[in-house]
């Protein structure tokens, strides 16, 4: 292996002693070191620590999904305390770190003024560990900008020290506390901290945190006051239509420049969708929206599609998987696919579109004005009857690059029609996803031959 490289990136590999000895010189000189799920032991952590002490070039260290434990993490952190260390990004996600190990981590943060990103998700830090961590984050020498704390066993009690960090750190840009039971009280404390903070927050992720409709008024104020905010993730919280009505005035505020909004599985219906459509019409900045897992129904689909045809809506990615759509709404989506010049990605899987609905979509995709690049139609009750329309569309459409038809009953007859179109030079598809579809050995041979004959295409199954 050449030693003249900038990055060492190894994933899911059990490292033998010989292989490890080969890698050690690289640890001493690479700018980026990623050893993801490599079965690292405490002894290996000592080797890593020694190597890091003599590597002033290190900018990123990723040790995620290794059972380092508090002792192993301590060893690694000792290596980062060299005066020459200039690390910017550290990931210890899923490393069996506990609250007891947060004291050492807190002390280390005081000595790493260059560290900008810290990933600690999937470690059981608890409230006591988070308190220790925040003491380090509050040190004037710590200039952290991005902190990920997903699945860290935090409660509302952790939100007070986090809010103190937000108030004290003007450089803070991204906070992820998803999948922690901070609940309504904790979210309110965080929002107050953000309200009082001079930080230019760019991303706030609170998915599956027990956010309620009452919190949406607090969040509305944050969205309205933080012009820097670009991403808000609130998925898997019980916001409901009432919460959407509270949140939307903030999204409509003139200073709001939100780009990405994730509100999947939030109990939103067509009524809440109507409020959201006002935002889509008014905010050209909003580019990515996930409404997956909300019972929007065909009425919600109609409202969305009418909005997508408005000149003020410049959405590029729409996720409406599992939204209780039927074939009845597909004529609306077909119009969007034919006329909208901004929508590049549509995730509409797990809706009962059936053959009639997919054939409607194909009519829109086949129009010269279609710009869609990625389409997910997995688990949409599609049969081989739709494959002739899909096959013709793949030849007529020159923008589509990815198509997912997984978990549909296409069979050999349907797959053959797709293969015959995809193999043509005029078809520009780059990725065809066919999980959970059953075909014969003969068809398997055809698919393998297709990939061999057309290297630009990947068939994923």
From Swiss-Prot:
LRR repeats lie at residues 20-48, 49-76, 77-105, 106-133, 134-162, 163-190, 191-219, 220-247, 248-276, 277-304, 305-333, 334-361, 362-390, 391-418, 419-447. InterPro entries: Leu-rich_rpt, Leu-rich_rpt_Cys-con_subtyp, LRR_dom_sf, LRR_RI_cap, NLRP_innate_immun_reg. GO terms for molecular function: ribonuclease inhibitor activity. It is found in: Cytoplasm; Nucleus. GO terms for cellular component: angiogenin-PRI complex; cytoplasm; cytosol; lamellipodium; nucleoplasm; nucleus; plasma membrane. It comes from the Eukaryota. GO terms for biological process: cell migration; regulation of angiogenesis; regulation of Arp2/3 complex-mediated actin nucleation; tRNA stabilization. It comes from Pan troglodytes (Chimpanzee). The gene is RNH1. The modification Phosphoserine is found at residue 91. Forms high-affinity heterodimers with RNASE1, ANG and RNASE2. Keywords: Acetylation, Cytoplasm, Leucine-rich repeat, Nucleus, Phosphoprotein, Repeat. The modification N-acetylserine is found at residue 2. Ribonuclease inhibitor which inhibits RNASE1, RNASE2 and angiogenin (ANG). May play a role in redox homeostasis. Required to inhibit the cytotoxic tRNA ribonuclease activity of ANG in the cytoplasm in absence of stress. Relocates to the nucleus in response to stress, relieving inhibition of ANG in the cytoplasm, and inhibiting the angiogenic activity of ANG in the nucleus. Residues 2-11 are annotated as: 2 X 5 AA tandem repeats of S-L-D-I-Q. The LRR domain forms a horseshoe-shaped structure that interacts tightly with target RNases via a large protein interaction surface on its interior side. This is Ribonuclease inhibitor.
């Amino acid at each position: 292996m050449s030693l003249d490289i900038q990055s060492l990136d190894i994933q899911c590999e059990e490292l033998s002693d010989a292989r490890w000895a080969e890698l050690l010189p690289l640890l001493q000189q690479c700018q980026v070191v990623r050893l993801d799920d490599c079965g690292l032991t405490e002894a290996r952590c000592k080797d890593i620590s020694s190597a890091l002490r003599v590597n002033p070039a290190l900018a990123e260290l990723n040790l995620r999904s290794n059972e380092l434990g508090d002792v192993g993490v301590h060893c690694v952190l000792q290596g980062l305390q060299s005066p020459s260390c200039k690390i910017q990004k550290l990931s210890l996600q899923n490393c069996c770190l506990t609250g007891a190990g947060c004291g050492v981590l807190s002390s280390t943060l005081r000595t790493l003024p260059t560290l900008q990103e810290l990933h600690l998700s999937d470690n059981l830090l608890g409230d006591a560990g988070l308190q220790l961590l925040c003491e380090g984050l509050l040190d004037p020498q710590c200039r952290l900008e991005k902190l990920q704390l997903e699945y860290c066993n935090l409660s509302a009690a952790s939100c007070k020290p986090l809010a103190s960090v937000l108030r004290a750190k003007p450089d803070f840009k991204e906070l992820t506390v998803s999948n922690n039971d901070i609940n309504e009280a904790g979210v309110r404390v965080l929002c107050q901290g953000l309200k009082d903070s001079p930080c230019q927050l760019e991303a706030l992720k609170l998915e599956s945190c027990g956010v309620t409709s009452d919190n949406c008024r607090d969040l509305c104020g944050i969205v309205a006051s933080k012009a820097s905010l670009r991403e808000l993730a609130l998925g898997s919280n019980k916001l409901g239509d009432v919460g959407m009505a509270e949140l939307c005035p903030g999204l409509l505020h003139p200073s709001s420049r939100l780009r990405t909004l994730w509100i999947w599985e939030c109990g939103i219906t067509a009524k809440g969708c109507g409020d959201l459509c006002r935002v889509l019409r008014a905010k050209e900045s909003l580019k990515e929206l996930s409404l997956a897992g909300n019972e929007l129904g065909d009425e919600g689909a109609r409202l969305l599609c009418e909005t997508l045809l408005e000149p003020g809506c410049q959405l590029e990615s729409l996720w409406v998987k599992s939204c209780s759509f039927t074939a009845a709404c597909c004529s609306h989506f077909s119009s969007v696919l034919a006329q909208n010049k901004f929508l590049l990605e549509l995730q509409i899987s797990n809706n009962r579109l059936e053959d009639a609905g997919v054939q409607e979509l194909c009519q829109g995709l086949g129009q010269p004005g279609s710009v869609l690049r990625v389409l997910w139609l997995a688990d949409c009750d599609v049969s081989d009857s739709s494959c002739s329309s899909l096959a013709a569309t793949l030849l007529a459409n020159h923008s589509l690059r990815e198509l997912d038809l997984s978990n549909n009953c296409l069979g050999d007859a349907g797959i053959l029609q797709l293969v015959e179109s995809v193999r043509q030079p005029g078809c520009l598809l780059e990725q065809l996803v066919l999980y959970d579809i059953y075909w014969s050995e003969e068809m398997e041979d055809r698919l393998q031959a297709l990939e061999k004959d057309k290297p630009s295409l990947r068939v994923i199954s």
